[in-house]
From Swiss-Prot:
Annotated PANTHER family: 50S RIBOSOMAL PROTEIN L15, LARGE RIBOSOMAL SUBUNIT PROTEIN UL15M
Protein role: Binds to the 23S rRNA.
Compositionally skewed regions (Gly residues) per UniProt: 22-35
Subunit structure: Part of the 50S ribosomal subunit.
Native source organism of the sequence: Rubrobacter xylanophilus (strain DSM 9941 / JCM 11954 / NBRC 16129 / PRD-1)
Name under which the protein is recorded: Large ribosomal subunit protein uL15
Signal peptide: none
InterPro entries from the UniProt entry: Ribosomal_uL15 (IPR030878), Ribosomal_uL15/eL18 (IPR021131), Ribosomal_uL15/eL18_sf (IPR036227), Ribosomal_uL15_bac-type (IPR005749), Ribosomal_uL15_CS (IPR001196)
Length: 152
């Protein structure tokens, strides 16, 4: 067998459709474009948002103003798992970090979870809390109980 004897497997290659090459081919004369009209002409194409004459979607919807237009919002905003100060009382230990919160079922098990401690509820023992963010009220309640709020 030589390279010039190789050919692709039968059915793996489709022949190009040759249009405008005589009536007997089935694609002569109008080349599969029908009779007249915009789609029968060369060099014309309806723009992508054209909806056949009805009012297009981008014109039916109102224009958004200000920050809602998306200029000032980040593409991927940070999403925090919220944990209230009152829920920390159920977690054992002097130091409460992400592993302890996961074990208690207060946050998702994903490794890249961001945690924010919020100020709802009370805590009555001094604990060191490690999280990505704290609300002002949460930080004040933790420190008032004699604990520390450490930002990761």
């Amino acid at each position: 067998m030589r390279l010039n004897e190789l050919s692709p497997p039968p059915g793996s290659r489709r022949a190009r459709k040759r249009v405008g090459r005589g009536e007997g081919s089935g694609y002569g004369k109008t080349s599969g474009r029908g009779q007249k009209g915009a789609k029968a002409r060369s060099g014309t194409k309806a723009y992508t948002t054209y909806e056949g004459g009805q009012m297009p979607l981008q014109r039916r919807l109102p224009r958004l103003k200000g920050e809602a237009r998306g200029r000032h919002t980040p593409a991927h905003p940070k999403v925090y798992d919220p944990v209230n100060v009152g829920e920390l009382a159920a977690v054992e230990g002097d130091t409460i970090g992400l592993d302890e919160l996961r074990a208690a079922g207060l946050i998702r098990k994903k490794a890249d979870t961001l945690v924010k401690i919020l100020g709802d509820g009370e805590i009555d023992r001094p604990v060191t809390v490690r999280a990505h963010a704290f609300s002002r009220a949460a930080r004040e309640k933790i420190e008032a109980a004699g604990g520390r709020a450490e930002v990761l």
